[in-house]
């Protein structure tokens, strides 16, 4: 019988939950507002309500996987310091949910970028590769490493933080405090600011009309829409972003000798407006011996990979520990 798990993507604005089949992927899904400003207790109440909803009528669910921002301990039970989640200094999610659920269930927590990478590896475009680097472009820049179809976590579980890798030691500071980190260029807020400066004197750009003459309202989504309509200014901004991404990925490839790269997250919807520049830049920043087989692809499953990966985390854990669910 095909195993099922509940996969949860805990985002800053939305909690997305799905019932995941090991063989076919997402069966059904639901989402509710996170309400992160209410603090961890209320947010965990909402997570528990989604778990309860999916367990009703699905007695064969073998566990719950949660992808969350912030630092995750090695045991995959505790979330510490997730950005934009007030009061989450260190929250033992496993214990908190156990006290809220009528029936105990295996619960695992993973960094959200790691969960997305695992989802891509088993249900998305990443299934073509046994090893790849995952980059997620959204509010911030996330990263993960898949090595032989499993998450590579490093010595303490925090490997893969590509967003904190620097491309300019005297550059602008990212939220992490790292000067010139790639997130300081490609994070949503930073990219929008760069677009404002770049387009300020290009009065013929569609962006002025789309933002109703107030460039403070520019978003990455607007850039993509304008590029689709042929706006050269928007295309230039997205190509600039792709160039920066290619620079940092060159360092990652040189370090890891992993030559396949999957790009996901909301900004990845801009597709080749970003990725063409990434590919053409990347080749110039990778040592010749590692240039063979380089490939940069867009994740086609969108934001579903977070839920899928969180669910698959459960299946992988059961297999690794030789556990047969009751």
Predicted regions and their residues:
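ATP-binding/phosphotransfer module of carbohydrate and carboxylate kinases, centering on a glycine-rich
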Residues: 1-63, 72-78, 97-105, 119-130, ...
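A short acidic Gly-Thr/Ser loop motif
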Residues: 8-13, 136-140, 158
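Short beta-strand scaffold segments in enzyme catalytic cores
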Residues: 15-19, 141-146
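A short acidic/small-residue loop/turn micro-motif
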Residues: 34-35, 87, 159-161, 167
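A charged helix-plus-loop insertion that forms the helical arch/lid used to bind
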Residues: 77-90
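General beta-strand structural signal in soluble alpha/beta enzymes
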Residues: 106-111
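Adenylate-forming
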Residues: 116-122, 143-145, 164-165
């Amino acid at each position: 019988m095909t195993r099922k798990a509940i996969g949860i993507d805990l985002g800053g604005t939305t909690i997305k939950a799905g019932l995941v089949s090991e063989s076919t992927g997402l069966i059904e899904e639901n989402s509710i507002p996170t309400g992160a400003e209410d603090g961890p207790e209320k947010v965990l109440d909402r997570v528990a309500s989604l778990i309860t909803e999916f367990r009703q009528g699905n007695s064969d669910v073998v566990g719950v996987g949660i992808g969350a921002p912030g630092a995750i301990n090695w045991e995959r039970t505790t979330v510490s310091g997730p950005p934009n989640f007030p009061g989450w200094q260190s929250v033992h999610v496993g214990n908190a949910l156990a006290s809220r659920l009528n029936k105990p269930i295996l619960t695992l927590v993973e960094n959200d970028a790691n969960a997305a990478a695992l989802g891509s590896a088993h249900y998305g475009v990443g299934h073509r590769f046994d090893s790849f680097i995952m980059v997620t472009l959204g509010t911030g820049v996330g990263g993960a490493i898949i090595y032989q179809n499993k998450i590579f976590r490093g010595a303490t579980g925090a490997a893969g933080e590509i967003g904190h890798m620097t491309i300019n030691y005297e550059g602008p500071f990212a939220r992490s405090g790292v000067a010139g980190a790639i997130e300081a260029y490609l994070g949503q807020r930073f990219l929008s600011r760069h677009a404002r400066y770049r387009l300020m004197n290009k009065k013929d750009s569609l962006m002025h009309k789309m933002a109703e003459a107030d460039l403070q309202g520019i978003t990455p989504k607007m850039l993509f829409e304008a590029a689709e309509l042929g706006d050269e200014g928007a295309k230039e901004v997205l190509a600039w972003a792709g160039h920066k991404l290619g620079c940092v990925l060159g360092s990652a490839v040189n370090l890891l000798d992993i030559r396949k790269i999957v790009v996901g997250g909301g900004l990845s919807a801009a597709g080749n407006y970003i990725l063409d520049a990434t590919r053409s830049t990347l080749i110039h920043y990778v040592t010749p011996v590692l240039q063979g087989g380089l490939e940069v692809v867009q994740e086609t499953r969108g934001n579903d990979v977070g839920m899928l990966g969180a669910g698959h985390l459960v299946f992988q854990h059961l297999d690794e520990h030789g556990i047969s669910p009751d």
